[in-house]
């Protein structure tokens, strides 16, 4: 089996693949101070509860935006599974041309999303990943990654507002019944949720205009289910797009090495 690990600022998502099939997945809180031994114990418990043994894992692919945890999981792979993990980054060749000024600066999760999106939907295609930050990734008609946009995630944007405005308070992040709020709660939900949906719609329209194509837009990430229903420009929601991209990156790298 192949273990794929997507390390984000808020969550660590772990998946187990048997061939092309995602057999199990877990979303865990990003705990930067947790040791390799602690992660190993937790993953063992989760895998056993799902009917799997980590002894079946023969390879690991990691996407990470948290350098300290990259090292933690690399040590876990080496010590407990006796494998050298693939650490995805924008400077490596996965068969996806990366045509930006500094390829090494492109987040590994964005590379994985692009790989999986092209495999599933062809090119051109746009991927919007809703996480701690919201990223827009653009693949042109030639199948090349050409950049995108990064916006504050809806959760941290909302937290910044309520923390800095003395008379505002936290409310449930959900779409209100109308844009014109009749009270503070509805007004906050309108400005935050509906306003964020319009941010996404507007950027998708601008990106399509610059591309010169009505490229399909795919939503992914932990908060996709909140915003995607409010954005008719989306063609699909793919909750595990990054995990599938990690699997593909691993397979492509091993094919190129003749493994």
UniProtKB/Swiss-Prot annotation:
MF annotations from Gene Ontology: ATP binding; metal ion binding; pantothenate kinase activity
Entry binding sites for substrate: 107-110, 184
Catalysed reaction, written as an equation: (R)-pantothenate + ATP = (R)-4'-phosphopantothenate + ADP + H(+)
Residues engaged in binding K(+): 129
Entries under CDD domains matching the protein: ASKHA_NBD_PanK-III
Keyword match Nucleotide-binding: yes
Chief localization: cytoplasm
Essential cofactor(s): NH4(+); K(+)
Source superkingdom: Bacteria
Pathway membership, UniProt: Cofactor biosynthesis; coenzyme A biosynthesis; CoA from (R)-pantothenate: step 1/5
Keywords associated with the record: ATP-binding, Coenzyme A biosynthesis, Cytoplasm, Kinase, Metal-binding, Nucleotide-binding, Potassium, Transferase
Cofactor note: A monovalent cation. Ammonium or potassium.
Active site location: 109
GO cellular component: cytoplasm
GO biological process, one term: coenzyme A biosynthetic process
EC number per UniProt: 2.7.1.33
Transmembrane feature ranges: none
Subcellular location: Cytoplasm
Positions contributing to ATP binding: 6-13, 132
Subunit structure: Homodimer.
Known role: Catalyzes the phosphorylation of pantothenate (Pan), the first step in CoA biosynthesis.
Family of this protein: Belongs to the type III pantothenate kinase family.
The name this protein goes by in its record: Type III pantothenate kinase
Record organism: Thermomicrobium roseum (strain ATCC 27502 / DSM 5159 / P-2)
């Amino acid at each position: 089996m192949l273990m794929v690990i997507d390390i984000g600022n808020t969550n660590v998502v772990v998946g187990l693949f048997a061939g092309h099939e995602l057999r199990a997945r877990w979303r865990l809180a990003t705990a930067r101070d947790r040791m390799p031994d602690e992660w190993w114990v937790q993953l063992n418990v989760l895998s056993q509860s799902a009917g799997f043994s980590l002894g079946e894992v023969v390879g690991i692919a990691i996407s990470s935006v948290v350098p300290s945890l990259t090292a933690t999981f690399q040590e876990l792979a080496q010590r407990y599974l006796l494998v050298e993990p693939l650490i995805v980054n924008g400077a490596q060749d996965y068969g996806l041309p990366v045509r930006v000024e500094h390829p090494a600066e492109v987040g590994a999760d964005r590379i994985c999303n692009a790989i999986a999106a092209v495999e599933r939907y062809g090119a051109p295609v746009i991927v919007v990943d809703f996480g701690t930050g919201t990223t827009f990734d653009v693949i042109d008609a030639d199948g090349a990654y050409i950049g995108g946009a990064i916006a504050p995630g809806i959760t941290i944007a909302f937290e910044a507002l309520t923390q800095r405005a003395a008379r505002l308070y936290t409310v449930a992040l959900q779409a209100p019944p109308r844009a014109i709020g009749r009270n503070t709660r509805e007004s906050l939900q309108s400005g935050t949720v509906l306003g964020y949906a319009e941010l996404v719609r507007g950027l998708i329209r601008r990106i399509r205009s610059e591309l010169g194509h009505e490229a399909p837009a795919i939503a992914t990430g932990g908060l996709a289910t909140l915003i995607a229903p409010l954005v008719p420009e989306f063609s699909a929601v793919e909750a595990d797009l990054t995990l599938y991209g990690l699997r593909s990156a691993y397979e492509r790298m091993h094919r190129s090495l003749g493994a």
